[in-house]
Protein backbone atom coordinates (compact mmCIF):
# COMPACT_ATOMS: atom_id res chain seq x y z
CA UNK A 1 0.00 0.00 0.00
CA UNK A 2 1.12 3.54 -0.73
CA UNK A 3 0.03 6.27 1.67
CA UNK A 4 0.42 9.92 0.73
CA UNK A 5 -0.03 12.43 3.55
CA UNK A 6 -0.77 16.08 2.82
CA UNK A 7 0.51 18.16 5.72
CA UNK A 8 2.77 17.32 8.62
CA UNK A 9 2.80 18.43 12.27
CA UNK A 10 0.31 16.70 14.58
CA UNK A 11 -2.21 15.02 12.28
CA UNK A 12 -0.06 14.23 9.27
CA UNK A 13 3.13 13.18 11.03
CA UNK A 14 1.20 11.04 13.52
CA UNK A 15 -0.66 9.26 10.71
CA UNK A 16 2.58 8.49 8.88
CA UNK A 17 4.36 7.23 12.00
CA UNK A 18 1.43 5.01 13.02
CA UNK A 19 1.17 3.56 9.51
CA UNK A 20 4.84 2.65 9.56
CA UNK A 21 4.43 0.81 12.87
CA UNK A 22 1.48 -1.13 11.45
CA UNK A 23 2.89 -1.84 7.99
CA UNK A 24 6.70 -2.07 7.65
CA UNK A 25 6.34 -2.59 3.90
CA UNK A 26 4.09 0.39 3.13
CA UNK A 27 5.36 3.22 0.96
CA UNK A 28 4.75 6.46 2.86
CA UNK A 29 5.24 9.97 1.48
CA UNK A 30 4.54 13.16 3.45
CA UNK A 31 4.10 16.37 1.45
CA UNK A 32 4.51 19.51 3.54
CA UNK A 33 4.09 23.01 2.12
CA UNK A 34 6.20 24.67 4.82
CA UNK A 35 9.84 24.41 5.80
CA UNK A 36 9.33 22.12 8.80
CA UNK A 37 7.31 18.92 8.89
CA UNK A 38 7.16 18.28 12.63
CA UNK A 39 7.38 21.02 15.24
CA UNK A 40 5.85 21.89 18.59
CA UNK A 41 3.28 24.46 17.52
CA UNK A 42 1.86 24.61 21.05
CA UNK A 43 5.26 25.82 22.30
CA UNK A 44 5.69 28.59 19.72
CA UNK A 45 4.66 31.51 22.00
CA UNK A 46 7.16 30.45 24.66
CA UNK A 47 10.04 31.30 22.35
CA UNK A 48 9.00 34.96 22.66
CA UNK A 49 9.43 34.94 26.44
CA UNK A 50 12.67 32.98 26.51
CA UNK A 51 11.13 29.86 28.04
CA UNK A 52 12.28 28.14 24.85
CA UNK A 53 15.70 29.69 24.27
CA UNK A 54 16.56 28.29 20.83
CA UNK A 55 13.98 28.19 18.04
CA UNK A 56 15.67 25.08 16.65
CA UNK A 57 14.42 23.24 19.74
CA UNK A 58 10.87 23.78 18.49
CA UNK A 59 11.56 21.42 15.59
CA UNK A 60 10.81 17.87 16.69
CA UNK A 61 11.73 15.83 13.60
CA UNK A 62 13.53 16.70 10.39
CA UNK A 63 12.90 14.98 7.05
CA UNK A 64 16.22 13.20 7.48
CA UNK A 65 15.19 11.92 10.91
CA UNK A 66 11.91 10.61 9.51
CA UNK A 67 13.82 8.76 6.82
CA UNK A 68 16.38 7.24 9.20
CA UNK A 69 14.03 6.43 12.09
CA UNK A 70 10.83 5.48 10.26
CA UNK A 71 11.69 4.96 6.58
CA UNK A 72 9.21 7.71 5.72
CA UNK A 73 9.90 10.05 2.81
CA UNK A 74 9.20 13.66 3.73
CA UNK A 75 9.22 16.39 1.10
CA UNK A 76 9.06 19.89 2.55
CA UNK A 77 8.29 23.06 0.58
CA UNK A 78 6.06 20.87 -1.59
CA UNK A 79 2.51 22.14 -2.06
CA UNK A 80 -0.31 19.88 -3.21
CA UNK A 81 -2.30 21.88 -5.75
CA UNK A 82 -5.03 19.40 -6.67
CA UNK A 83 -6.35 15.86 -6.29
CA UNK A 84 -7.34 13.65 -9.21
CA UNK A 85 -9.63 11.17 -7.48
CA UNK A 86 -10.21 9.08 -10.60
CA UNK A 87 -6.50 8.63 -11.30
CA UNK A 88 -5.70 8.55 -7.55
CA UNK A 89 -2.92 11.12 -7.85
CA UNK A 90 -2.10 14.46 -6.29
CA UNK A 91 -0.49 17.27 -8.27
CA UNK A 92 2.49 18.76 -6.46
CA UNK A 93 4.53 21.91 -6.95
CA UNK A 94 7.99 22.21 -5.41
CA UNK A 95 9.60 25.46 -4.28
CA UNK A 96 11.75 25.33 -7.42
CA UNK A 97 8.62 25.51 -9.55
CA UNK A 98 8.81 21.92 -10.76
CA UNK A 99 5.44 20.17 -10.82
CA UNK A 100 4.63 16.47 -10.87
CA UNK A 101 1.90 13.92 -10.06
CA UNK A 102 2.23 11.60 -7.06
CA UNK A 103 0.09 8.42 -7.03
CA UNK A 104 -1.58 7.07 -3.90
CA UNK A 105 -3.59 4.11 -2.67
CA UNK A 106 -4.73 5.96 0.44
CA UNK A 107 -4.59 9.72 0.91
CA UNK A 108 -4.56 11.55 4.23
CA UNK A 109 -5.49 15.24 4.31
CA UNK A 110 -4.01 17.06 7.29
CA UNK A 111 -3.58 20.62 6.00
CA UNK A 112 -4.51 22.20 9.33
CA UNK A 113 -6.04 25.64 9.69
CA UNK A 114 -4.85 29.07 8.60
CA UNK A 115 -4.81 32.18 10.80
CA UNK A 116 -7.77 34.45 10.11
CA UNK A 117 -6.48 37.71 8.61
CA UNK A 118 -9.59 39.78 7.77
CA UNK A 119 -9.14 41.85 4.63
CA UNK A 120 -11.64 44.31 6.09
CA UNK A 121 -8.88 45.50 8.44
CA UNK A 122 -6.91 48.16 6.63
CA UNK A 123 -3.17 47.50 6.97
CA UNK A 124 -3.53 43.82 7.87
CA UNK A 125 -0.77 43.03 5.35
CA UNK A 126 1.66 45.48 6.89
CA UNK A 127 5.29 44.54 7.62
CA UNK A 128 4.71 44.88 11.37
CA UNK A 129 1.74 42.45 11.43
CA UNK A 130 2.41 38.83 12.32
CA UNK A 131 0.57 35.56 12.83
CA UNK A 132 1.70 32.60 14.92
CA UNK A 133 1.30 29.37 12.97
CA UNK A 134 4.75 27.87 12.50
CA UNK A 135 8.43 28.20 13.39
CA UNK A 136 9.05 30.62 10.53
CA UNK A 137 6.28 32.90 11.86
CA UNK A 138 7.55 32.94 15.43
CA UNK A 139 11.14 33.59 14.37
CA UNK A 140 10.01 36.54 12.28
CA UNK A 141 7.93 37.94 15.14
CA UNK A 142 10.73 37.62 17.69
CA UNK A 143 13.28 39.14 15.34
CA UNK A 144 10.97 42.11 14.85
CA UNK A 145 10.08 42.75 18.50
CA UNK A 146 13.75 42.43 19.47
CA UNK A 147 14.60 45.45 17.32
CA UNK A 148 15.52 48.67 19.13
CA UNK A 149 12.49 50.90 19.55
CA UNK A 150 9.90 48.13 19.31
CA UNK A 151 8.32 48.24 22.75
CA UNK A 152 4.54 48.28 22.25
CA UNK A 153 2.77 45.21 20.92
CA UNK A 154 -0.95 44.84 20.24
CA UNK A 155 -2.38 41.33 20.25
CA UNK A 156 -5.64 41.07 18.32
CA UNK A 157 -7.60 38.20 19.86
CA UNK A 158 -7.90 36.88 23.39
CA UNK A 159 -7.98 33.13 22.80
CA UNK A 160 -5.36 30.58 23.82
CA UNK A 161 -2.70 31.78 21.39
CA UNK A 162 -3.39 35.45 22.07
CA UNK A 163 -3.06 35.00 25.82
CA UNK A 164 0.11 32.93 25.57
CA UNK A 165 1.67 35.48 23.22
CA UNK A 166 0.66 38.35 25.51
CA UNK A 167 2.09 36.65 28.60
CA UNK A 168 5.40 35.87 26.94
CA UNK A 169 5.78 39.34 25.46
CA UNK A 170 5.21 40.81 28.92
CA UNK A 171 7.87 38.48 30.29
CA UNK A 172 10.14 39.86 27.57
CA UNK A 173 9.51 43.35 28.92
CA UNK A 174 7.15 44.61 26.22
CA UNK A 175 4.12 46.85 26.68
CA UNK A 176 1.21 44.66 25.64
CA UNK A 177 -2.40 45.36 24.74
CA UNK A 178 -5.08 42.81 23.87
CA UNK A 179 -7.98 43.76 21.62
CA UNK A 180 -10.82 41.24 21.82
CA UNK A 181 -14.07 41.42 19.88
CA UNK A 182 -16.17 39.72 22.55
CA UNK A 183 -16.92 40.82 26.11
CA UNK A 184 -14.33 38.39 27.47
CA UNK A 185 -11.11 36.57 26.67
CA UNK A 186 -11.04 32.75 26.59
CA UNK A 187 -14.40 32.03 24.98
CA UNK A 188 -14.71 28.48 26.45
CA UNK A 189 -14.94 29.90 29.99
CA UNK A 190 -18.10 31.23 31.59
CA UNK A 191 -18.33 34.90 32.49
CA UNK A 192 -17.94 34.34 36.23
CA UNK A 193 -14.69 32.37 35.80
CA UNK A 194 -13.10 34.56 33.15
CA UNK A 195 -13.21 37.64 35.38
CA UNK A 196 -10.31 36.10 37.31
CA UNK A 197 -8.29 36.14 34.09
CA UNK A 198 -9.27 39.73 33.33
CA UNK A 199 -7.94 40.70 36.75
CA UNK A 200 -4.76 38.67 36.22
CA UNK A 201 -4.07 40.40 32.91
CA UNK A 202 -4.71 43.80 34.46
CA UNK A 203 -2.52 43.00 37.48
CA UNK A 204 0.34 42.11 35.14
CA UNK A 205 0.17 45.28 33.09
CA UNK A 206 -1.68 43.99 30.03
CA UNK A 207 -4.09 46.61 28.69
CA UNK A 208 -7.34 44.86 27.88
CA UNK A 209 -9.76 46.26 25.30
CA UNK A 210 -12.93 44.15 25.19
CA UNK A 211 -15.84 44.47 22.75
CA UNK A 212 -13.36 45.99 20.31
CA UNK A 213 -13.58 45.57 16.53
CA UNK A 214 -10.28 46.36 14.85
CA UNK A 215 -10.74 48.52 11.75
CA UNK A 216 -7.21 49.54 10.76
CA UNK A 217 -3.56 49.01 11.52
CA UNK A 218 -1.56 52.16 11.00
CA UNK A 219 1.99 53.29 11.63
CA UNK A 220 2.35 53.17 15.40
CA UNK A 221 -1.22 52.30 16.34
CA UNK A 222 -4.25 50.06 15.94
CA UNK A 223 -7.67 51.62 15.35
CA UNK A 224 -10.76 49.91 16.73
CA UNK A 225 -14.44 50.53 17.33
CA UNK A 226 -15.41 50.06 20.96
CA UNK A 227 -18.89 50.88 22.23
CA UNK A 228 -19.62 53.08 19.23
CA UNK A 229 -16.43 55.09 19.67
CA UNK A 230 -13.10 54.84 17.88
CA UNK A 231 -10.12 54.04 20.06
CA UNK A 232 -6.46 54.16 19.15
CA UNK A 233 -4.07 51.66 20.75
CA UNK A 234 -0.36 52.39 20.46
CA UNK A 235 1.52 49.55 18.76
CA UNK A 236 4.91 49.11 17.12
CA UNK A 237 4.02 45.51 16.26
CA UNK A 238 0.72 43.65 15.89
CA UNK A 239 0.04 39.95 16.40
CA UNK A 240 -3.10 38.65 14.70
CA UNK A 241 -4.51 35.89 16.91
CA UNK A 242 -8.13 36.27 15.88
CA UNK A 243 -8.65 32.58 15.27
CA UNK A 244 -8.15 30.00 12.55
CA UNK A 245 -10.12 28.77 9.55
CA UNK A 246 -9.89 25.17 8.28
CA UNK A 247 -7.84 24.75 5.11
CA UNK A 248 -10.46 23.06 2.94
CA UNK A 249 -9.87 24.46 -0.55
CA UNK A 250 -7.93 21.41 -1.72
CA UNK A 251 -10.69 19.08 -0.52
CA UNK A 252 -13.52 21.23 -1.87
CA UNK A 253 -11.86 21.60 -5.28
CA UNK A 254 -11.64 17.80 -5.43
CA UNK A 255 -15.38 17.53 -4.85
CA UNK A 256 -15.12 16.24 -1.29
CA UNK A 257 -18.04 17.14 0.95
CA UNK A 258 -17.74 19.81 3.62
CA UNK A 259 -19.73 19.66 6.85
CA UNK A 260 -21.98 22.09 8.69
CA UNK A 261 -18.98 23.83 10.28
CA UNK A 262 -17.24 24.10 6.87
CA UNK A 263 -14.65 21.56 7.91
CA UNK A 264 -13.99 18.50 5.77
CA UNK A 265 -16.84 16.05 6.35
CA UNK A 266 -15.66 12.69 7.71
CA UNK A 267 -17.33 9.57 9.07
CA UNK A 268 -16.49 7.74 12.29
CA UNK A 269 -13.41 6.27 10.61
CA UNK A 270 -12.20 9.69 9.42
CA UNK A 271 -12.99 8.85 5.80
CA UNK A 272 -14.17 11.69 3.62
CA UNK A 273 -16.91 11.31 1.01
CA UNK A 274 -14.24 9.42 -0.96
CA UNK A 275 -13.48 6.23 1.05
CA UNK A 276 -9.81 6.24 -0.04
CA UNK A 277 -9.27 9.78 1.26
CA UNK A 278 -9.11 10.52 4.99
CA UNK A 279 -8.93 13.80 6.89
CA UNK A 280 -7.87 14.63 10.45
CA UNK A 281 -6.83 17.62 12.52
CA UNK A 282 -7.93 21.24 12.37
CA UNK A 283 -9.32 20.95 8.83
CA UNK A 284 -11.69 18.07 9.59
CA UNK A 285 -15.13 18.31 11.14
CA UNK A 286 -15.52 16.40 14.38
CA UNK A 287 -18.37 15.27 16.61
CA UNK A 288 -19.19 16.76 19.99
CA UNK A 289 -19.96 13.85 22.30
CA UNK A 290 -22.00 16.01 24.70
CA UNK A 291 -24.19 17.99 22.32
CA UNK A 292 -24.26 15.27 19.62
CA UNK A 293 -23.60 17.91 16.99
CA UNK A 294 -20.80 18.54 14.47
CA UNK A 295 -17.93 20.72 15.64
CA UNK A 296 -14.32 21.64 15.05
CA UNK A 297 -11.64 21.50 17.68
CA UNK A 298 -8.13 22.82 17.09
CA UNK A 299 -6.35 20.80 19.78
CA UNK A 300 -3.36 18.48 19.53
CA UNK A 301 -4.73 15.59 21.60
CA UNK A 302 -7.85 14.90 19.52
CA UNK A 303 -5.81 15.31 16.32
CA UNK A 304 -3.33 12.67 17.45
CA UNK A 305 -6.11 10.26 18.40
CA UNK A 306 -7.82 10.79 15.06
CA UNK A 307 -4.57 10.23 13.17
CA UNK A 308 -3.96 6.95 14.95
CA UNK A 309 -7.54 5.79 14.40
CA UNK A 310 -7.42 6.65 10.70
CA UNK A 311 -4.19 4.71 10.18
CA UNK A 312 -5.69 1.78 12.07
CA UNK A 313 -8.73 1.81 9.80
CA UNK A 314 -6.56 1.86 6.68
CA UNK A 315 -4.97 -1.33 7.99
CA UNK A 316 -8.25 -3.00 8.91
CA UNK A 317 -7.98 -2.54 12.67
CA UNK A 318 -11.10 -1.66 14.68
CA UNK A 319 -11.42 1.41 16.85
CA UNK A 320 -14.11 3.25 18.79
CA UNK A 321 -14.72 6.88 17.87
CA UNK A 322 -16.35 8.59 20.85
CA UNK A 323 -16.05 12.13 19.50
CA UNK A 324 -14.56 14.97 21.50
CA UNK A 325 -15.50 16.78 24.70
CA UNK A 326 -12.95 19.61 24.45
CA UNK A 327 -10.35 19.57 27.24
CA UNK A 328 -7.73 22.30 27.38
CA UNK A 329 -5.51 24.29 29.71
CA UNK A 330 -3.29 27.35 29.67
CA UNK A 331 -1.03 29.20 32.06
CA UNK A 332 -1.58 32.93 32.45
CA UNK A 333 1.09 34.51 34.65
CA UNK A 334 0.41 33.13 38.16
CA UNK A 335 -2.88 31.47 37.24
CA UNK A 336 -3.38 27.98 35.84
CA UNK A 337 -6.55 27.65 33.78
CA UNK A 338 -8.27 24.47 32.66
CA UNK A 339 -11.66 23.52 31.26
CA UNK A 340 -13.42 20.48 29.86
CA UNK A 341 -16.80 19.61 28.43
CA UNK A 342 -19.53 22.22 28.24
CA UNK A 343 -19.52 25.58 29.91
CA UNK A 344 -22.81 26.65 31.44
CA UNK A 345 -23.48 29.03 28.55
CA UNK A 346 -22.69 26.31 25.97
CA UNK A 347 -24.99 23.82 27.70
CA UNK A 348 -27.85 26.30 27.76
CA UNK A 349 -27.25 27.22 24.11
CA UNK A 350 -27.46 23.51 23.27
CA UNK A 351 -30.81 23.31 25.06
CA UNK A 352 -29.55 21.13 27.91
CA UNK A 353 -31.23 21.92 31.25
CA UNK A 354 -28.39 22.53 33.66
CA UNK A 355 -27.11 24.23 36.77
CA UNK A 356 -23.68 24.90 38.22
CA UNK A 357 -21.84 25.40 41.48
CA UNK A 358 -18.79 27.56 42.17
CA UNK A 359 -16.50 26.56 45.02
CA UNK A 360 -13.20 27.96 46.33
CA UNK A 361 -11.58 25.15 48.33
CA UNK A 362 -7.83 25.10 49.04
CA UNK A 363 -5.77 23.23 46.46
CA UNK A 364 -3.87 21.56 49.31
CA UNK A 365 -4.01 21.50 53.10
CA UNK A 366 -3.97 25.07 54.40
CA UNK A 367 -0.94 24.48 56.63
CA UNK A 368 1.22 23.96 53.55
CA UNK A 369 3.17 27.11 52.67
CA UNK A 370 2.02 27.24 49.04
CA UNK A 371 -1.63 26.45 49.68
CA UNK A 372 -4.03 28.67 47.78
CA UNK A 373 -7.67 28.61 46.81
CA UNK A 374 -8.75 27.03 43.53
CA UNK A 375 -11.79 28.50 41.82
CA UNK A 376 -13.70 25.48 40.55
CA UNK A 377 -16.96 25.50 38.63
CA UNK A 378 -18.89 22.30 37.99
CA UNK A 379 -21.70 22.17 35.41
CA UNK A 380 -24.29 19.40 35.59
CA UNK A 381 -27.53 18.35 33.92
CA UNK A 382 -30.83 18.79 35.73
CA UNK A 383 -32.47 16.62 36.94
CA UNK A 384 -30.19 13.69 36.06
CA UNK A 385 -27.01 14.97 37.71
CA UNK A 386 -24.97 13.99 34.65
CA UNK A 387 -21.64 15.84 34.63
CA UNK A 388 -21.41 18.22 31.68
CA UNK A 389 -18.25 20.22 32.26
CA UNK A 390 -15.85 21.96 34.60
CA UNK A 391 -13.61 25.00 34.75
CA UNK A 392 -10.78 25.68 37.18
CA UNK A 393 -8.57 28.71 37.78
CA UNK A 394 -5.88 29.04 40.44
CA UNK A 395 -2.23 28.92 41.34
CA UNK A 396 -2.40 25.19 42.02
CA UNK A 397 -3.07 22.19 39.82
CA UNK A 398 -6.16 23.23 37.92
CA UNK A 399 -5.41 20.76 35.13
CA UNK A 400 -5.30 17.81 37.54
CA UNK A 401 -8.84 18.49 38.77
CA UNK A 402 -10.23 19.13 35.32
CA UNK A 403 -8.58 15.97 33.99
CA UNK A 404 -10.56 14.04 36.60
CA UNK A 405 -13.78 15.60 35.34
CA UNK A 406 -12.81 14.87 31.72
CA UNK A 407 -12.42 11.20 32.60
CA UNK A 408 -15.78 11.19 34.41
CA UNK A 409 -17.53 12.81 31.44
CA UNK A 410 -16.02 10.23 29.09
CA UNK A 411 -17.43 7.48 31.33
CA UNK A 412 -20.88 9.17 31.36
CA UNK A 413 -20.63 9.64 35.12
CA UNK A 414 -22.88 11.69 37.38
CA UNK A 415 -22.55 13.69 40.57
CA UNK A 416 -23.03 10.63 42.78
CA UNK A 417 -20.09 8.95 41.04
CA UNK A 418 -17.92 12.03 41.50
CA UNK A 419 -18.86 12.29 45.16
CA UNK A 420 -17.60 8.75 45.77
CA UNK A 421 -14.44 9.07 43.69
CA UNK A 422 -11.36 7.96 45.64
CA UNK A 423 -8.34 10.09 44.81
CA UNK A 424 -4.77 10.33 46.06
CA UNK A 425 -4.19 12.45 49.14
CA UNK A 426 -1.22 13.97 50.91
CA UNK A 427 -1.18 17.40 52.58
CA UNK A 428 1.38 18.63 50.04
CA UNK A 429 -0.79 17.58 47.07
CA UNK A 430 -4.39 18.10 48.06
CA UNK A 431 -7.02 17.66 50.74
CA UNK A 432 -8.63 14.50 52.07
CA UNK A 433 -11.86 15.59 50.44
CA UNK A 434 -10.54 16.80 47.10
CA UNK A 435 -11.74 19.86 45.24
CA UNK A 436 -13.76 17.71 42.82
CA UNK A 437 -15.39 15.75 45.67
CA UNK A 438 -16.38 18.98 47.41
CA UNK A 439 -17.86 20.39 44.21
CA UNK A 440 -19.92 17.21 43.76
CA UNK A 441 -21.24 17.40 47.32
CA UNK A 442 -22.33 21.02 46.89
CA UNK A 443 -23.89 20.22 43.51
CA UNK A 444 -25.86 17.32 45.01
CA UNK A 445 -27.22 19.61 47.71
CA UNK A 446 -28.45 21.95 44.98
CA UNK A 447 -29.72 19.15 42.72
CA UNK A 448 -31.75 17.51 45.48
CA UNK A 449 -33.15 20.82 46.71
CA UNK A 450 -31.43 20.69 50.09
CA UNK A 451 -30.27 24.25 49.54
CA UNK A 452 -31.14 27.06 47.17
CA UNK A 453 -28.44 29.26 45.73
CA UNK A 454 -27.84 32.41 43.74
CA UNK A 455 -24.79 32.98 41.57
CA UNK A 456 -22.24 35.77 41.91
CA UNK A 457 -23.56 37.31 38.69
CA UNK A 458 -26.87 37.97 40.48
CA UNK A 459 -25.47 39.70 43.56
CA UNK A 460 -25.21 43.21 42.09
CA UNK A 461 -28.91 43.14 41.27
CA UNK A 462 -29.70 41.99 44.80
CA UNK A 463 -27.64 44.78 46.36
CA UNK A 464 -29.16 47.43 44.13
CA UNK A 465 -32.67 46.22 44.97
CA UNK A 466 -32.00 46.34 48.72
CA UNK A 467 -32.12 42.57 49.31
CA UNK A 468 -31.47 41.24 52.81
CA UNK A 469 -27.90 39.88 52.76
CA UNK A 470 -26.25 38.26 55.78
CA UNK A 471 -22.46 37.96 56.06
CA UNK A 472 -21.61 35.15 58.51
CA UNK A 473 -17.86 35.83 58.62
CA UNK A 474 -16.19 37.06 61.77
CA UNK A 475 -16.16 40.83 62.50
CA UNK A 476 -12.50 41.23 61.52
CA UNK A 477 -13.13 39.63 58.14
CA UNK A 478 -16.19 41.81 57.64
CA UNK A 479 -14.14 44.91 58.40
CA UNK A 480 -11.58 43.92 55.75
CA UNK A 481 -14.20 44.09 53.02
CA UNK A 482 -17.93 43.42 52.77
CA UNK A 483 -20.95 43.79 50.53
CA UNK A 484 -22.57 47.18 51.01
CA UNK A 485 -25.64 46.90 53.18
CA UNK A 486 -24.88 43.35 54.33
CA UNK A 487 -25.75 42.43 57.92
CA UNK A 488 -22.86 40.87 59.84
CA UNK A 489 -24.09 37.94 61.94
CA UNK A 490 -21.01 35.72 62.45
CA UNK A 491 -21.54 31.97 62.44
CA UNK A 492 -19.99 31.86 65.92
CA UNK A 493 -22.81 34.13 67.18
CA UNK A 494 -25.65 32.87 65.01
CA UNK A 495 -27.41 30.69 67.56
CA UNK A 496 -27.56 33.59 70.00
CA UNK A 497 -28.75 36.08 67.36
CA UNK A 498 -31.25 34.08 65.33
CA UNK A 499 -33.99 36.56 66.11
CA UNK A 500 -32.20 39.07 63.85
CA UNK A 501 -32.81 36.91 60.78
CA UNK A 502 -36.19 37.74 59.18
CA UNK A 503 -38.71 35.13 58.04
CA UNK A 504 -40.78 37.31 55.73
CA UNK A 505 -38.25 38.26 53.02
CA UNK A 506 -35.65 36.25 51.10
CA UNK A 507 -32.36 36.09 53.01
CA UNK A 508 -29.09 35.66 51.12
CA UNK A 509 -26.22 34.20 53.12
CA UNK A 510 -22.52 34.36 52.35
CA UNK A 511 -19.11 33.98 53.96
CA UNK A 512 -15.70 33.86 52.29
CA UNK A 513 -16.19 30.78 50.13
CA UNK A 514 -19.78 29.59 50.86
CA UNK A 515 -18.82 26.86 53.34
CA UNK A 516 -19.65 28.65 56.60
CA UNK A 517 -22.73 30.23 55.04
CA UNK A 518 -23.86 26.70 54.14
CA UNK A 519 -23.44 25.71 57.80
CA UNK A 520 -25.47 28.76 58.80
CA UNK A 521 -28.17 27.93 56.26
CA UNK A 522 -28.46 24.37 57.60
CA UNK A 523 -28.71 25.69 61.16
CA UNK A 524 -31.45 28.14 60.28
CA UNK A 525 -33.37 25.70 58.07
CA UNK A 526 -33.34 23.25 60.95
CA UNK A 527 -35.00 25.91 63.10
CA UNK A 528 -37.79 26.62 60.62
CA UNK A 529 -36.47 29.22 58.19
CA UNK A 530 -37.67 28.55 54.63
CA UNK A 531 -36.56 31.77 52.93
CA UNK A 532 -32.80 31.16 52.67
CA UNK A 533 -30.36 31.25 49.75
CA UNK A 534 -26.63 30.61 49.74
CA UNK A 535 -24.54 32.89 47.52
CA UNK A 536 -22.41 30.52 45.43
CA UNK A 537 -18.78 31.60 45.62
CA UNK A 538 -19.53 34.08 48.43
CA UNK A 539 -17.33 37.13 49.09
CA UNK A 540 -14.26 35.76 47.35
CA UNK A 541 -16.32 35.03 44.25
CA UNK A 542 -18.05 38.41 44.45
CA UNK A 543 -14.73 40.27 44.71
CA UNK A 544 -13.22 38.40 41.77
CA UNK A 545 -16.36 38.77 39.66
CA UNK A 546 -16.87 42.48 40.28
CA UNK A 547 -13.32 43.87 40.41
CA UNK A 548 -12.26 44.14 36.77
CA UNK A 549 -15.59 45.40 35.46
CA UNK A 550 -15.79 47.97 38.25
CA UNK A 551 -12.35 49.25 37.24
CA UNK A 552 -12.88 49.09 33.48
CA UNK A 553 -16.38 50.58 33.49
CA UNK A 554 -15.81 53.05 36.30
CA UNK A 555 -18.97 51.88 38.01
CA UNK A 556 -19.84 52.09 41.69
CA UNK A 557 -18.60 48.97 43.54
CA UNK A 558 -21.07 46.91 45.54
CA UNK A 559 -18.35 46.16 48.10
CA UNK A 560 -16.60 48.65 50.36
CA UNK A 561 -13.31 46.83 49.78
CA UNK A 562 -12.29 43.84 47.65
CA UNK A 563 -10.69 40.84 49.30
CA UNK A 564 -8.94 38.24 47.16
CA UNK A 565 -7.52 36.09 49.97
Q: Model-derived features: where do they sit?
A:
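Mid-to-C-terminal Rossmann-like scaffold of FAD/NAD(P)H-dependent oxidoreductases
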Residues: 1, 7, 283-396, 427, ...
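Beta1-alpha1 glycine-rich phosphate/pyrophosphate-binding loop at the start
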Residues: 1-75, 79, 116, 166-189, ...
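A Rossmann-like FAD-binding core segment of flavoenzymes
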Residues: 25-27, 69, 75-94, 102, ...
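Rossmann-like dinucleotide-binding cores of NAD(P)H-dependent redox enzymes
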Residues: 58-59, 152-154, 160-216, 299-303, ...
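Short hydrophobic core segments
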Residues: 102-112, 235-243, 307, 385
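Glycine-rich dinucleotide-binding loop and its adjacent helix/turn
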Residues: 109-172, 207, 260, 266-268, ...
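FAD-site-proximal beta/loop scaffold in flavoenzymes
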Residues: 125-148, 221-223, 232-309, 404, ...
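Rhodanese-like catalytic fold shared by cysteine-dependent sulfurtransferases
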Residues: 416-427, 431-458, 462-468, 475-508, ...
Amino acid sequence: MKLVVVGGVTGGASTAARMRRLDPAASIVVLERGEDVSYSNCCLPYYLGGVVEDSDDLILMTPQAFRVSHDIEVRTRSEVLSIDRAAKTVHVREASGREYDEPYDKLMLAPGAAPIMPRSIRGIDGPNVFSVRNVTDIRALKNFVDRPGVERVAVVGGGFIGLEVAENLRRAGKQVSILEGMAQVMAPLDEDMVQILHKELDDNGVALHLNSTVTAIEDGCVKAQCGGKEVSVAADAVVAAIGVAPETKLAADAGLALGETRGILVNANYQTSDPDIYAVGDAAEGYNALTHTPGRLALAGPAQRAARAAADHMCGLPHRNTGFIGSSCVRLFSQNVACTGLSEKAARKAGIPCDSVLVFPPDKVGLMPDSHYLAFKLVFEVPTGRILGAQAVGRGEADKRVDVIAAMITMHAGLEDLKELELCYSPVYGTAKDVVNQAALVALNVLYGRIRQVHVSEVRGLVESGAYIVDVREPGEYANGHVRGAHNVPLSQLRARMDEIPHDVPVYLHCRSSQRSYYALCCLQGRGWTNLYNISGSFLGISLYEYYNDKALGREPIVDRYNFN
